[in-house]
């Protein structure tokens, strides 16, 4: 989810409140970053602490490395972690944008990356590397980014890579219910069991890997 500290429309508190009303238990706010705006991570952490200390929802601070040169992705992931990001995504080679070739490969090779978001026509080699490095792949609810969901679901399932279903929320209308998220997983070709894994078990594994308690 993205706040107004990158290209989202809402403050972290309003994102959390709207998610809470939809019965979400845990969300991550992962604003778009490159070397120019890493300070956005620290800006949201105090607000996230306020939310976690007072509301019945868990908010995880994170970052989504976006449109950066592939050569600096691992460096940016390390810096983001030091600044307080507990979960690191990379903005993958979606069919909807001219993401630089090599981004997917750099992301799955990095031990500091947790999720490769909307990876488009990700290759077999890249998926195998993702499995070896414990990098999850995203099934996206977002228009445009969702175009390769079927490909991602199929190749990830064949190789045994964990999948995550994400909204890529930028505005209030992007937030969805658990039932809607299940349908997106099924629409991508996942079985009911695999869709549930992508919505419940796999996110918990990532949170545990990041040391987040919930």
Residue ranges, per PLM feature:
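Glycine-rich, proline-tolerant flexible connector loops at the mouths of alpha/beta enzymes
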Residues: 28-41
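Histidine-centered catalytic micro-motifs
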Residues: 1-6, 29-32, 119
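Extended substrate/RNA-proximal surfaces in nucleic-acid metabolism proteins
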Residues: 38-139, 207-214
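Catalytic domains of carbohydrate-active enzymes, especially glycoside hydrolases
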Residues: 15-27
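Catalytic metal-binding/acid-base residues of hydrolase active sites
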Residues: 2-4, 33-34, 66, 93, ...
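Acidic/histidine-rich helix-loop elements
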Residues: 2-8, 36, 71
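Charged catalytic cores and adjacent phosphate/nucleic-acid-binding surfaces used
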Residues: 1, 97, 105-214
């Amino acid at each position: 989810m993205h706040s107004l500290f990158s290209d989202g429309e809402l403050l972290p508190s309003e994102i959390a409140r709207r998610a809470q009303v939809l019965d979400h238990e845990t969300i991550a706010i992962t604003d778009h970053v490159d070397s120019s705006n890493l300070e956005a991570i620290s800006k949201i952490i105090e607000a996230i602490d306020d939310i976690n200390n007072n509301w019945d929802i868990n908010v995880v601070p994170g970052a989504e490395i976006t449109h950066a040169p592939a050569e600096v992705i691992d460096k940016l992931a390390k810096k983001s972690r030091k600044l307080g990001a507990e979960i690191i995504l990379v903005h993958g080679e979606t069919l909807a944008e001219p993401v630089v070739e090599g981004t997917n490969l750099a992301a799955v090779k990095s031990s500091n990356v947790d999720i490769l978001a909307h990876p488009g026509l990700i290759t077999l080699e890249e998926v195998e590397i993702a499995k070896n490095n414990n990098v999850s792949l995203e099934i996206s609810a977002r228009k445009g980014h969702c175009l390769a969901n079927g490909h991602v679901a199929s190749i990830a399932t064949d190789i045994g890579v964990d999948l995550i279903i994400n909204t890529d929320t930028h505005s209030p209308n992007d937030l969805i219910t658990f039932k809607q998220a299940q349908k997106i997983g099924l629409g991508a070709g996942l079985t009911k069991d695999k869709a549930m894994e992508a919505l419940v078990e796999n996110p918990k594994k990532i949170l545990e890997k990041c040391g987040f308690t919930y």
